[in-house]
Swiss-Prot record:
Example GO BP: ribosomal small subunit biogenesis
Species in which this protein is naturally found: Schizosaccharomyces pombe (strain 972 / ATCC 24843)
Post-translational modification Phosphothreonine, affected residues: 83
A GO molecular-function descriptor: RNA binding
Localization annotation: Nucleus, Nucleolus
Record-given protein name: Ribosomal RNA-processing protein 14-N
Lineage, opening ranks: Eukaryota, Fungi, Dikarya, Ascomycota, Taphrinomycotina
Keyword Glycosyltransferase: no
């Protein structure tokens, strides 16, 4: 067993020597050191983020953030015509928002008008059913109760 242990130790020493030639920055990540120092978000911060997610003001702020992020990216990638591109991006976003708001409003108006028409149409057949039931003298529920089932004898 001593020979085996000596061989293993020799291999281990050789392997450790090879590893010593590799700089540590190649196999250790820098951001892992900060990973454990990061604070967890508090309950209030989570609530604020959730509110911003569903509020219209949050959409405006997100669009501003997106335009700032995109403009930073454009500045780093290309230095020419960066103001024209960011202006077009901001204009297109505002136009899209305007179109979306108008479509939503149109759909709401159509829905209100459609609901009124449906309510009117739904009331008419109900009145007709009542008239037909009055003439027969028995309601549909009473007719079903008196009907014998085919398995009544079993």
């Amino acid at each position: 067993m001593t020979e085996v242990e000596e061989r293993i130790n020799a291999w281990n020493d050789g392997f450790e020597e090879l590893l010593s030639y590799i700089p540590a920055k190649l196999y250790y990540r820098e951001h892992t050191a900060n990973q454990w120092k990061q604070k967890k978000s508090t309950l209030e911060e989570k609530k604020e983020r959730r509110k911003m997610k569903f509020s219209l003001d949050g959409l405006v702020n997100d669009a501003d953030d997106d335009s700032q992020k995109s403009s930073k990216w454009e500045q780093s990638s290309t230095m020419s015509d960066d103001t024209d591109v960011s202006d077009r991006h901001a204009e297109s976003m505002s136009q899209i928002r305007g179109k979306l708001a108008s479509k939503i409003q149109d759909l709401r108006e159509k829905r209100k008008a459609g609901d009124l028409n449906q309510k009117r149409q739904n009331k008419r057949p109900v009145e007709n059913e009542k008239d037909s039931q009055k003439g027969s003298g028995k309601s549909k529920v009473q007719k079903k109760k008196h009907k014998a089932s085919p398995r009544a004898g079993f």
